Amino acid sequence: MPRYFDVEMDEELIRELKDTLAYMVNPVTIDLFLDDESRCETCPDAYKLMKTIADASPVREGRRMIELRVFYKSNPEHLKEFERQKVERVPTVAMLDGMIRYTGTPAGEEIRGLIETIMRISEGESGLEPETKKVLASLPNLVHIETVVTPSCPYCPYAALLANMFAYEAWKQGNPKVLSDTVEAYENMDIAEKYGVMSVPAIALNGVMSFIGVPYEEDFIVYVKSASEGKLEELVPKTEGEASGL
């Protein structure tokens, strides 16, 4: 597979990362699902990236504020965690017992959205509007959000962050009915091709392409609610905000 991203960080970037993560309030656990390099060409890069991020987090009371747990598909003892979090592809980065996940390496522009997701979970605040929070607390059925992205897309982190915060807010309110899955297109071309993705971010809800571009929160919650209620076919796909060519 050609390299579509670079996971190396220079000293300045690592310093900026440390400065941001220094404001973490509560610890955050990140699960990294990998396989041997012979079966997963990008897994070493995913490990290198996530280890760099975890090591940049502050130490409080003798422990890192980002706890990185690593599970290998080749290790029989780790397979239960793959099954529990319903992880089928590697590499996968997961939080909140798999309700927020990155299928593929969250490199390039996606690092920004990942760090902001970590910070908001650490701070305990999704940043969503009160009405959005109210709807998320009462969703009846699971909504699987797939946000298809590329490492070079400058708009994709905003779409991924919004989806992540929908998942976090629902989880936080004890109604984990939103699974936010940020899919790196180049590592998962079959998913991008399934949805006919030509521009990113592209967002599918329960297997139905619903948005091209970064959705507005007030529109996104309408679609997520409809998907949860099985009424998504009543809405037409929308193009909002900015998008980049695949």
Give names to the regions the model predicted.
Residues 1-29, 110-141, 232-246:
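N-terminal leader/targeting and pre-domain segments
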Residues 5, 173, 197-199:
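Acidic, low-complexity intrinsically disordered regions
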Residues 7-62, 136-174:
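Local sequence-structure signature of Cys/Sec-based thiol-disulfide redox active-site neighborhoods
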Residues 18, 79, 133, 189-192:
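Short hydrophobic/charged patches on amphipathic alpha-helices used for structural packing
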Residues 59-77, 173-190:
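Thiol-based oxidoreductase modules, predominantly thioredoxin-like and allied folds used
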Residues 77-97, 194-206:
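Structural micro-motif
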Residues 94-125, 199, 204-246:
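Non-catalytic, surface beta->alpha helical segment in thiol-disulfide oxidoreductase systems
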Residues 161-163, 179, 196, 235, ...:
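Terminal low-complexity, intrinsically disordered regions
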